[in-house]
UniProtKB/Swiss-Prot annotation:
The keyword Secreted applies. Coiled coil: none annotated. This is Delta-amaurobitoxin-Pl1b. Changing residue 21 to A: No change in binding affinity and in lethal dose. Changing residue 12 to A: More than 160-fold decrease in binding affinity and no change in lethal dose.
Length: 37
């Protein structure tokens, strides 16, 4: 399963973002999925 917009993600181990999203780690300490459009 993948996670969507605003959900917590981890680029190195998952959970991974759904298609159309990328894992943004700017808002530490957690990474969150952002729309990549």
């Amino acid at each position: 399963a993948c996670v969507g917009d605003g959900q917590r993600c981890a680029s190195w181990s998952g959970p991974y973002c759904c298609d159309g999203y990328y894992c943004s780690c700017r808002s530490m300490p957690y990474c969150r999925c952002r729309n990549n459009s």
